[in-house]
Amino acid sequence: MVWSSNMSSFLLILLILNSTHFSLMANGRPEPDSVEFTKSGDQDVKMMMRGLIGSRPPRCERVRCRSCGHCEAIQVPTNPQTKLHSPLTTSSSSSSETIHLDYTRGDDSTNYKPMSWKCKCGNSIYNP
């Protein structure tokens, strides 16, 4: 009788330990050889591409680009514009002049050169 009681206790403890083992199993990333990995692999690539910093090149498929045959997306520097208010103007007159800056550093605090995407078709450059 003692043997069956000990055996029952042992089996009960073993059953409890095994059931908690499966419920507490870590669910990490799937292994590369598994079927789950190939299904979620495409979604991971899409999510990673969305998280990249910066802009994407445009699709240069407009009417302008069809005439030359080969059209490609390129990055070109933009010309920043700064509006300066004349010190002689009063608050009632709001005249301002626009000055084009060719990548001058100004206060020597930055060397930022903004770039934008354009479509290049032969020797011509178009807005996308």
Swiss-Prot record:
Its main location: secreted. The keyword Signal applies. One of its GO terms (cellular component) is extracellular region. It is found in: Secreted. Residues 1-28 form the signal peptide. Controls stomatal patterning. Residues 79-100 are annotated as: Disordered. Keywords: Developmental protein, Disulfide bond, Secreted, Signal. The keyword Iron does not apply. PANTHER family: EPIDERMAL PATTERNING FACTOR-LIKE PROTEIN 2 (PTHR33109:SF7), EPIDERMAL PATTERNING FACTOR-LIKE PROTEIN 4 (PTHR33109). InterPro entries: EPFL. Residues 79-90 have a biased composition (Polar residues). Belongs to the plant cysteine rich small secretory peptide family. Epidermal patterning factor subfamily. GO terms for biological process: guard cell differentiation; stomatal complex development. Disulfide bonds join C60-C119, C65-C71, C68-C121. This is EPIDERMAL PATTERNING FACTOR-like protein 2.
